[in-house]
Amino acid sequence: MPNKLLIVESPNKVKTIQKYLGDEYEVKSSVGHILKLSTKGEYHLGIDFDNWEPIMIVDSTKTKIIKELKDAAKNADEILVATDPDREGEAIAKNLVDTLKVQDKYKRIKYNEITKEAIEYAINNPLEIDENLVKAQKTRRLLDRIIGFKLSELMQKKIKNAPTMPSAGRVQSIALKLVCDREKEIESFIPIKYSKIEANIDNFNNPTFYYKLANKDFDNDNTWISPTKIEKIYDDVKTNNKLKIIDIKITKSKEKQIIPFKQSILYKDAKYSSQIVQSSAQSLFEHGLISYPRTDSTRISESFIQKAKKYIAEKFGNEYVANDVKGFSGEQDAHEAIRPTNIELTPDFAKINYSLNEIDTYIYTLIYNRTISAIMATPIRETHHYDLLNKTATNEYYFKTSYSKLLFDGYYKVLGYPEMPSLIPNYQIGDYLDVNEYIRLDKQTQPPARYNDGSLIKKLDDIKVGRPSTFASTVSVIKKRLFVETHEDKTLHPTEFGKTVLEKLINGFPKTINEEYTAQVEEVLDEISDGKQDYKKLL
């Protein structure tokens, strides 16, 4: 009979962890939070304002689970609390220990991946509950209740006949504001018309290339021409159908190093909605295929890097191993980047042996390829830059173009190759090239792009609003409440209802509904997590 009880949050982890630990342990799940914030007390906020403590009650849906956990705890000599390694997980751990009354025989264990090695290491290196993390979660929860209740109360008074119950929250209001602000930018955008001239030239068996005008008399980026000047220039350029090569420069450059995924970048790069990506990543984590996905770190453990380097050397050769893996977060934060748990688990192998569906296979492949590419040598390209002269009877016009070729393919072996010409023409300075035709291109500047799920989450992350654990739910909530809608091209558009809600919020709470305030709150929550700030002071 088991004499040790290990408690996790998600029931999906139970079977895998039980398999690793054997009969000595009983693995059970709390199925998330077992307590919830009540609606008792002053203003129905569930807060004891005398000491700024939450009034917590048992979640009625968890009564049976709590009884089962209590019964299991009575028969166990040791309780291992293995909830997730973040603020929410720490709060759940604290509530479990207090509710089960096992303060004298519990151990807190944390792991970033569900593998036998990681679980055993966590068990052999137990911790205490981090009270600072618990305080940060408590502060975040109370803040969200105070602000959310008051904002929602205002909405319900100000907006009648709404399509959904008007409500608002600290972070979701900023997400709505970003979408509405971007829509205003687009609506007020005045396009600027401009023109370009390109020369079409045949180069042996190569595709047709275009040589862009580079006369500095025209504008800042050397290629735009105002519509008022284009006619005269275009007519003059066409009088000479030869371009003379006046300069050739050859440069070598390394491509940028790939940085491993943190959660917001995974959302941005994936082709699915944030909710689908979150669900898939969580499933991959629970099945032991990837590390903890709700992370804002780009750090990879040294032990994994060494294993990956060995794998890369064996599969591709020593020259494909990065000499120095730079660019990752250097601080020893609690989490790593999102990475595979085992570099040997290739996407094809994982798909077959773990019966991954199409979406999970896609997300795992993204994560696997991104990780291995981050530890591979960067590609090197050689670029040939050509300056060309069109000399007419009245003026001189300069054109430019460039060709690149790979000298070393590096991580492109995994990520795929960029489009490049099959060969670089053998031009010399002084050569004349025949122009088939000059092409006038009339264009106009474009407004900023609307957000989609991924780019909105990336923006929230960039301005330090919200946390990895809440990004997907934040976007989901503003959709469900009909504040924004997703169009066929996956872009987010504010509804008239959403615009009205934001207007009322800003008029009622101008200091709260702004990016700077919300980012400052996140900064203080981090300081509380680190024990550097008194949580009651913020509240």
Write out the residue ranges for each language-model feature.
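Intrinsically disordered, low-complexity regulatory segments
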Residues: 1-147, 224, 275, 436
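Conserved nucleotide-binding/hydrolysis micro-motifs of P-loop NTPases
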Residues: 11-14, 31-37, 85-89, 112-117, ...
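Alpha-helical scaffold elements adjacent to nucleotide-binding pockets in ATP/GTP-utilizing enzyme cores
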Residues: 16-20, 68, 91-99, 118-122, ...
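Long, highly charged, low-complexity internal segments
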Residues: 26, 35-60, 166-286, 317, ...
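C-terminal or mid-to-C-terminal helical accessory/interaction module adjacent to the motor/catalytic core
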Residues: 114-201, 250-251
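Core structural elements
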Residues: 140-152, 199-201, 252-261, 278-290, ...
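Accessory beta->alpha helical hairpin/"wing" motif in late/C-terminal subdomains of nucleic-acid enzymes
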Residues: 291-316, 473-512
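Leucine-rich, amphipathic alpha-helical/linker segments
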Residues: 318-344, 511-539
